[in-house]
Swiss-Prot record:
Gene: PDX1
Main function: Catalyzes the formation of pyridoxal 5'-phosphate from ribose 5-phosphate (RBP), glyceraldehyde 3-phosphate (G3P) and ammonia. The ammonia is provided by PDX2. Can also use ribulose 5-phosphate and dihydroxyacetone phosphate as substrates, resulting from enzyme-catalyzed isomerization of RBP and G3P, respectively. Also plays an indirect role in resistance to singlet oxygen-generating photosensitizers.
Keyword vocabulary terms for this entry: Lyase, Pyridoxal phosphate, Schiff base
Sequence positions that bind D-ribose 5-phosphate: 43, 172, 233, 254-255
Name listed for the protein in its UniProt record: Pyridoxal 5'-phosphate synthase subunit PDX1
Organism classification: Eukaryota, Viridiplantae, Streptophyta, Embryophyta, Tracheophyta
Superkingdom field: Eukaryota
Other information: Vitamin B6 is an essential quencher of singlet oxygen in plants, that can protect cellular membranes from lipid peroxidation.
TM region positions: none
Binding residue positions for D-glyceraldehyde 3-phosphate: 184
UniProt pathway annotation: Cofactor biosynthesis; pyridoxal 5'-phosphate biosynthesis
Species assigned in the record: Phaseolus vulgaris (Kidney bean)
Amino acid sequence: MEGEGSRVVALYDGNGAITETKKSPFSVKVGLAQMLRGGVIMDVVNADQARIAEEAGACAVMALERVPADIRAQGGVARMSDPQLIKEIKRAVTIPVMAKARIGHFVEAQILEAIGIDYVDESEVLTLADDANHINKHNFRIPFVCGCRNLGEALRRIREGAAMIRTKGEAGTGNIIEAVRHVRSVMSDIRVLRNMDDDEVFTFAKSIAAPYDLVMQTKQLGRLPVVHFAAGGVATPADAALMMQLGCDGVFVGSGVFKSGDPAKRARAIVQAVTHYSDPEILAEVSCGLGEAMVGINLSDTNVERFANRSE
């Protein structure tokens, strides 16, 4: 488990560390994402839920028409949310508001930027718009969030301009197993990378199809060059604390809050669990009396669609 001091993220562009006198547009976006470090980002579908999330202590909300559990249950094509809904949620809260765009759908991202969204999540939870290309995130002023299952995928998204990385997990399932698998994969590769010499790093970068300079930066930092949040299946305070103890910088919570018996109480408990993730006594206290958790999905069922596998 990492200490708090080791969670400070250096700012990097393609040429190395950025100093105060040399601020690139990308470094500004990475800095905005760092402001969310140590926090909880909650999915909401209306202004009332957004207010509950803010009162519970969420650092940001994700504005959606349907939470991932409903996307799974209802099927169909999942697209960017109605801009009117996003505007209503923005008016209801003072914390940052995120919204999702389909992978590769740069026009959805342009619309979200035009209405003043704070962050865009290029998300595999929505139906793919382009199965070969992600959005060139350097073309936008606002920070982007992208998902990953492993280190190579994370660094490819950062090269495209992602200012925050999250584990993909399996959103809408209430099942943490895939998120744990993905964060352990990233952390394991970083531990191995730190002990490599330069020749080995070059070969390793090719093997994971990642940019060599970003692999070297990751080796030097001992972590990803941007903030790294957990997402996908976080449903309880214990789930949230687990992801923090595994080394994540914060947590996304989707269906796990507003598909539970007492959303307001569970939201507060998850925020407290992220803040006090290394204190079992506080974790035990905040886990009591939360009501029924979301039912969830057993991922051993072969009929379950894997959102995480929708893109590379």
